[in-house]
Amino acid sequence: MFLDECGFLLIPNVRRTWAPRGHTPIIPHRYRRDKVSAISAVTVSPRRRRCGLYIHFDPGSNITHVEVAVFLRAVLRQLRGHVIVLWDGGSIHKGPDVRALLTRCPRLHVEPFPGYAPDLNPDVA
């Protein structure tokens, strides 16, 4: 299972604008910094050769080690047998809730990616 998390800022992204010469263009928008955080996992079944996608959105807050542990428990309920988790070296993967889950769940094995290798993780794309 490949696991990763990301965040999206919902602010306008203006590429081009137009205004008469001498007038600075003003683009009105609400200065609210709404955001959505997401955590997802891509699974590959070795026997049936099927892929699975598990995703959870958390609007308005950051993904913490608590959400990572809850997400892992939810995904483990859907999968059978031993599960190998491949993830980056993020600090939220080393929080107390995640460490407690890893010690309680013997069928869960973790393999970290090398230092900076997003191209190795299909969940990043």
Give short role names for the model-derived ranges.
Residues D88-G89, P96, E111-A125:
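RNase H-like two-metal-ion nuclease catalytic core shared by retroviral integrases
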Residues M1-R73:
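Extended, low-complexity cationic-aromatic segments
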